[in-house]
Amino acid sequence: MRIAFLGTPAFAVAALDALDRAGHALVAVVAQPDRPAGRGQALREPATKAWARAHGVAVLQPEKVRDGTLAAALRALAPDALVVAAYGRILGKDLLTLAPHGAINVHGSLLPRWRGAAPIQWAVAEGERETGVTIMQMDEGLDTGDILLQRALELREDDTSETLAPRLAALGGEALAEALRLLEAGAIVPVRQDPAQATLARILEKEDGRVAWESPARRVADRLRGFTPWPGAFTTLEGRTLKVLEARPAADLAAPAGEPGEAEVVAGRGLAVACGGGTALLVTRVQLEGRPAQSALDLANGLRRKRFRLGT
């Protein structure tokens, strides 16, 4: 097939690799514009743009996608299908209906669960034990199109969104190649989504990372894993921001007496923090505002205290 690809971050590169291996003709890669990044705020090109340049594929980086300009440019390339993977923009009907096979999306969840911009993060943060990828025929709704193919993946106990994303990306590439093969053969029967089963994976905000110590320890740990690397998990210690970098539920430890957020040193292990329902979270690595990351025990030693309150 002649494919026009729309995608921006590293997650989308696995789909490009899969299309290339399957012998599809990539007529263009459409990515978001280069953006300032890092401390120096130097312009950084998207991962998909770097891939396209390395493979000799034309790159388009429009600021706007709904003024007809992009649709006209792609129409001139006569693609058989548009493939979309984490592009980060909402496409209008002119793009969705441009190619004979329409627009096909690689989505990082088992739709209709986790429709939206952050499916990987929310699946981990909500304690899912299984997620996966969906190859979907796009429509004008938010991830509401018909399902062409799905592949499931079991989450590991220590998965974060950062460790899960590359595995889902690879699985998505494999599923995409298979779906296109079946589509060309006329062997796919699209399946409508059940809206009653839908959940929303909204865009993450900084405040999502604030630890709610009144939640059970398992939920606090799941949120930490889901929100790694951004926005991370953070609390306060005597008015200073404290990032919680590593923690896990500790069923073998009694929760410190007092309100949720009460923390005490567990010799040789870390900080036991009281959470909701009488549960305990063992915090092992932290970063106090203005300091480098350190073990929770080193933090306690530096404060010369065995017990203190978090969230104050």
Swiss-Prot record:
Its EC number is 2.1.2.9. Disulfide bonds: none annotated. (6S)-5,6,7,8-tetrahydrofolate binds at S109, L110, L111, P112. PROSITE patterns: GART (PS00373). It is an enzyme of class 2 (transferase). CDD domains: FMT_core_Met-tRNA-FMT_N (cd08646), Met_tRNA_FMT_C (cd08704). InterPro entries: Fmt (IPR005794), Formyl_trans_C (IPR005793), Formyl_trans_C_sf (IPR037022), Formyl_transf_N (IPR002376), Formyl_transf_N_sf (IPR036477), Formyl_transferase-like_C_sf (IPR011034), GART_AS (IPR001555), Met-tRNA-FMT_C (IPR044135). Gene3D superfamilies: Formyl transferase, C-terminal domain, Formyl transferase, N-terminal domain. SUPFAM superfamilies: FMT C-terminal domain-like, Formyltransferase. The keyword DNA damage does not apply. The keyword Transferase applies. Pfam families: Formyl_trans_C (PF02911), Formyl_trans_N (PF00551). Keywords: Protein biosynthesis, Transferase. One of its GO terms (cellular component) is cytosol. Attaches a formyl group to the free amino group of methionyl-tRNA(fMet). The formyl group appears to play a dual role in the initiator identity of N-formylmethionyl-tRNA by promoting its recognition by IF2 and preventing the misappropriation of this tRNA by the elongation apparatus. Belongs to the Fmt family. This is Methionyl-tRNA formyltransferase. It comes from Anaeromyxobacter dehalogenans (strain 2CP-C).
